[in-house]
């Protein structure tokens, strides 16, 4: 279910404050966050945000095509190791 338009997009307060502070200073620094549910806003474009995936923080460079998506969409939490290859020689006839 989509979020109500009257509420607006969710962005963690601490993350928004850090972004606004860096925009005022015109600095580009990696911002570490655990807030995977925060929505990407246009003021975040050009910043690098390190999003936690459960084990480590993955740096993500924010582009204009990412606006409206969540931060967690760009840091995968599961490792896909590939499907097991079936060995037909070891099978019984």
UniProtKB/Swiss-Prot annotation:
Q: What is this protein called?
A: Small ribosomal subunit protein uS19c
What GO terms describe the biological role, i.e. biological process, of this protein? Answer: ribosomal small subunit assembly; translation
Q: What does this protein do?
A: Protein S19 forms a complex with S13 that binds strongly to the 16S ribosomal RNA.
In the record, the note on similarity to other proteins reads:
Belongs to the universal ribosomal protein uS19 family.
Which NCBIfam families does the annotation name?
rpsS_bact (TIGR01050)
Q: Which GO terms describe its molecular function?
A: rRNA binding; structural constituent of ribosome
**Gene from which the chain derives:** rps19
Which residue ranges are recorded for the region named Disordered?
Answer: 73-93
Record carries keyword RNA-binding: yes
């Amino acid at each position: 279910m989509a979020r109500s338009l009257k509420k607006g997009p969710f962005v963690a307060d601490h993350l928004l404050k850090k972004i606004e502070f860096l925009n005022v200073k015109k600095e580009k620094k990696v911002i570490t966050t655990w807030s995977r549910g925060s929505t990407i806003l246009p003021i975040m474009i050009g910043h690098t945000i390190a999003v936690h995936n459960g084990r480590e923080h993955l740096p993500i460079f924010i582009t204009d095509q990412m606006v409206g998506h969540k931060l967690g969409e760009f840091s995968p939490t599961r490792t896909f190791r590939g499907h097991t290859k079936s060995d037909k020689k070891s099978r019984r006839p």
